[in-house]
Amino acid sequence: MAGRLLSVENIDVYYGEFQALFGVSLEVYEGEVVALVGANGAGKTTTLKTISGLLRPRRGRIVWEGQDITSVPAYQRAELGIVHVPEGRGIFPYLTVYENLVVAAYTRRARERFEESLEMVYELFPRLRERKRQLAGTMSGGEQQMLAIARALIQRPRLLMLDEPSLGLAPKLAREVVYLARRLRDEYGITVLLVEQNVRLSLKVADRAYVLETGRVVREGPAGELEKDPEIRRAYLGI
């Protein structure tokens, strides 16, 4: 098995006095696509925010390649290669497509290989090359999502965390965006941690998955096995 990139070890996370995560643990190995699935409010987005450094756990650890990074600020985690595409895209609507990509290259690892990364994202998303002088806020929802992912790729991620990448997209485009996770792994060697509202689709794309309910990991295993599990099928797949 490839080396372990990330370990989340028994974390408790709060918003004020409200506890959102209860002893959550998970692992991500290099070259995997790992899915976090669960109902709205289960704690999936909170888990990603904690890994990226936007939230600090009150208990437990975040370990990256064997090093405890629990106290490392978010901007330094980006330098390590931990890159987060948040729900809602997070682009700059009044900048052009190209300017959005330039601004994304704020880490040293991104600046050093910007031109190479730019060609990579233009190959993945030819529409962005065509519209590089267009204001980002005037593009369609699907194009904005492409740009959000492209901005993350400019940062040369080793772990790319995608939070609800298909949200608000038409079904065909949503499927293409989610399957992009597998393409990034297969063609570019990028490890992906995926949160996706379409549980059926995310289990088809992922190698392994964790199921969260009310802030706790209640199931984990190979995605194909979870997809066939009667309880998962009944609770999340409507079967």
Predicted regions span which residues?
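ABC ATPase C-loop
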Residues: 152-153
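The feature captures the beta-strand-to-loop junction immediately N-terminal to the Walker
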Residues: 37-39
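ABC-type ATPase nucleotide-binding domains, specifically the catalytic core motifs of the NBD
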Residues: 16, 72, 97-116, 124-129, ...
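Conserved catalytic motifs of ABC-family nucleotide-binding domains
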Residues: 156
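Conserved ABC transporter NBD signature motif
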Residues: 60-67, 80, 113-118
